[in-house]
């Protein structure tokens, strides 16, 4: 792993470090230790295993548990694009495109500690992070099993809020039936996610049945 970049979704700045930095791994470890959830694109199979391998070899313990939101999994399960690559998806959604790819000479330059090559590498990395965040917000209404943001609040929540983005602005739109009962269904005005209320408005009674085989 030559470098990494990351940002918080509610802040502007992008963190980045390269292999030669003294806190190359400890800074990343601290960020993951603080994170409730990590958004990435194919990170479950690629980025995170590489990062964990670096941590292990450096003698670092696992950071505190965090949820993973892999946008590639959402793209594959919910849509059918000609290509599932971040560059294609971001352009298809009108967000923008990745920085022009790194050439073999650029990679060799980084290995040889060439300043110009490193600058290009970090710029490429930061652009990927910026695109990933924008794609995340575009895909947000479609993401299944998104972590409940209300569970990570420091204060007590005394109002019903959207479990995905925490907004208090939503509207009731019909009911939803589950195996245990019927609940009010809501649509968030901010992230446009669907969710259900906590209280049952009707209970389903299931009778015991027997059958002969």
Where are these regions (language model features)?
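RNase H-like nuclease fold core
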Residues: 1-12
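Short cysteine-rich clusters marking metal-coordination/redox-active sites
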Residues: 162-165, 188-191
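Short linker/helix segments within small regulatory modules
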Residues: 175-185
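Short, non-ligating residues that shape and space the ligands of small metal-coordination modules
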Residues: 168-174, 197-198
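Conserved DEDDh/DEDDy metal-dependent 3′-5′ exonuclease domain
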Residues: 10-92
């Amino acid at each position: 792993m030559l470098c990494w970049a990351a940002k918080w979704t509610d802040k502007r700045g992008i963190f980045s470090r390269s292999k030669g930095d003294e806190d190359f791994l400890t800074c990343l470890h601290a960020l993951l230790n603080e994170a409730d959830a990590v958004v990435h694109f194919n990170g479950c199979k690629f980025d995170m295993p590489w990062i964990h391998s670096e941590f292990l070899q450096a003698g670092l313990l696992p950071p505190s548990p965090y949820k993973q939101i892999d946008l590639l999994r959402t793209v594959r399960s919910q849509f059918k694009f000609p290509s599932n690559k971040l560059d294609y998806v971001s352009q298809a959604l009108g967000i923008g495109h990745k920085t022009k790819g790194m050439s073999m000479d650029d990679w060799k330059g980084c290995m040889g500690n060439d300043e110009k090559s490193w600058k290009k590498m970090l710029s490429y990395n930061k652009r990927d992070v910026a695109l990933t965040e924008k794609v995340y917000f575009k895909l947000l209404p479609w993401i299944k099993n998104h972590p409940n943001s209300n569970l990570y609040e420091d204060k007590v929540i005394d109002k019903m809020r959207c479990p995905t983005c925490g907004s208090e602005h939503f509207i009731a739109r019909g009911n939803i039936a589950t195996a245990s009962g019927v609940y009010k269904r809501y649509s968030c005005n901010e992230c446009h996610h669907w969710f259900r209320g906590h209280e049952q408005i009707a209970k389903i009674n299931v009778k015991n049945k027997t059958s002969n085989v």
